[in-house]
Amino acid sequence: MKRGSSLKYGLLFSAIFIVFFSVSLLLHLPASFALKHALKVRGLQIDGVQGSIWQGSASNIAWQRVNYGSVQWDFQFSQLFKGKAELAVRFGRDSDMNLRGKGYVGYSMNGAYAQNLVASLPAEDVMKYVPNIPVPITAVGQVELTIKHLQQGQPWCQAGEGTLTWSGAGADTPLGSLDFGPVIADVTCQDNTIAAKGAQKTVQVESEFEASLTPNRRYATSAWFKPGAEFPQAMQNQLRWLGKPDNQGKYQFTYQGRL
C-alpha cells in the first residue's frame, strides 16, 4: 500500500511539476523565438523583436516595402474568460506615413476584431496615396480614424462603427487657400458594405458628402459644396467650368464605379 501511495504521489507531483514548468515556459516564451518558427508571410517583415509573446515590442513592421513603424503589445488575460485573445497595442513610431495609433485588437469565435482603436496621420501624408489630381494641392491638418468596434468579414467587415475626423482641415492651391474647419464623417459597416457620411462648414465653403463600398467592390459617392461669403475670388472665377449651381447655390457631384 505504501509503495502504491508513494507511486501515486510521485506521479501527482511529476504532473504538477510538468504543468507549472510548461506554463512558466509558455509565459516566458520569447517573441523572437515564436516569430522565428512562425509561418512566413510574403511581403511582411518584422524587425527588432523584444519581450515575450504576451508583452513585447518590435522596432519596425514593414508590409510590401512600406514601413509602418514600431509596435508594442500587451496581452489582456482578463479577456480569456470571455473567449477572446486580445492585445492592447500602440503603433506607428518612425513610420513612413507618420502614423500613430493605439487600441485593442483580438480574435474571438466570430473572427478577428478591433475596438477602441485610434489611428492618426498628417493630411499631407494622406495625399501621397490619393490618385493624381490635375491641380497641385497641399493638404493641411490631421486625419484621425476612431474605430469603436469592427468585426472581421469577407471581404471587408461584418459589422463596424467609427468616425473619421480631419481637424484643422485646409488646402493650399495656386489659386488660393481654403479653410474647411473640422471635417467629420460617420463611418459604418454592415454585412460587408462600408458607408460614410460627413459634412463641414466655414465662412469660405460648406459641403456634405456620402460614399459607400459594397462587397463586390462597387462604389458610389455623392457630394455638394456651396461657396461662402469669403470664398477666394480667384477660385470663384474658375467655378464657371463646373456648370451652374442649383437654386440653393450648391454644386452637385455624383460618381460611381468599381475598384
Regions found by a protein language model. Name each.
Residues L44-P136:
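N-terminal beta-strand/beta-hairpin edge segment
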Residues K8-L27:
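Hydrophobic membrane-insertion alpha-helices, especially the h-region
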Residues L29-G51:
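Alpha-helical transmembrane signal-anchor/signal-peptide segments
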